[in-house]
Amino acid sequence: ISSIIHSSLCLPATMPKAFIATIIALAFSPESSYAFAPTRGGGLVSSSLNAFEFNNPFAALTGGNGGSGNKVAVIAGATGYIGKSTVRESVRQGYKTVALVRDKKKVESDEGKMLYGKFFEGADIVECDVCDAEKLTETLKEISSQVNGNIDAVVSCLASRSGIKKDAYAIDYQATLNCLESGRAVNARHFVLLSAFCVKNPWLQFQQAKLKFEEALQDQKDMTYSIVRPTAFFKSVSGQLEVIQQGAPFVMFGDGEVTRCNPISEADLATYLINSISDKTRRNKIINLGGPDEPLTMKKQGEMLYKAVGKEPNFFYAPLWLFDVIIDSLQWVADTLKSEKFENAAELGRIGKYYAVEDMLTTDPSEKFGTMTLQEHYDKIAVEGQEYDPYTTMFAKAPTKESEKEKVAA
């Protein structure tokens, strides 16, 4: 299909066919259709979460060693990229930390311990379906009873992975609203929301869903809140590491100077989120937040990545008009066939275009936080590798069983 697209659209022969094939795959595969969307935050919390099983998951709630018990934080979306770092930071700061997960057995399996062990040490893991409002409230009431009604904060790191309308409103709006309403039901004091910088210019479904929840959070009066809108995560701008290590070019859009960003590390962002529980200057505020770097273009990011791997830069410039051709084509098919799958594919194309043309950048010194630079991150992952996430970028490469065994052995 990618070869046909190349010839029919008269695309340059040098354009990576994987780029075209991935976009076309959006319309045909439930899994690959999500692979194009850049990660915006939080972890996978599907709208088809497992049913909640109330088998006294709180038996060891007061047995964690990660806090004095005087301060309590409940983390939703705990297994996500930012969520797991937030759990660790909450424990580090002395909170009795409750990590809400959809599948406790999976988290506590051997594989789960490899993924989450260092992040969840000292935290209490509680299985819960955040999409089930009644069960979520029941869960938080049980937690509250175990800590004498002393829940300082509910921290939501929830985010849909795909960004399509159905998922966005199920997670970015409704599941997050469930967390708010459950927090209000148990008189939790503060709500910290991991939102997204890009909602400032909302022309995507997930942005509108996030804004709808932000409005609900601001309208209620029972809990104080802090809305944190990070620019971009390090993971979101690291997806081409493996392909350039293998000799493929770094792909960018336009001339590589179209957009600028100052991404923030997961550890720095987690620190900011947990600090927001007790920092009264952030009460009832919306905070745009970026990392310590100066504005970085996509070309500059590529140069930094090549520096980290010790190779000469090799760039491929993808034309921005390609997005319009693909989006318009998919939308035409969606409208003609009344196809939800093609509608979702068109939305994913719009998400890709958004991040190719919009700055994710804070310039006010008060909106910069953290110590880790993107170059330091690139230098680190060039040596140690990075956790595979197919949702980060179309260029991510799935690990083989052999490579995973080698990583564990190392």
Briefly describe each language-model feature range:
Residues 137, 177-180, 266-274, 371-379:
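Short, amphipathic alpha-helical "lid/cap" segments that border enzyme active or binding sites
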Residues 151, 176, 240, 298, ...:
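A general structural signal for well-ordered alpha-helical segments in protein cores
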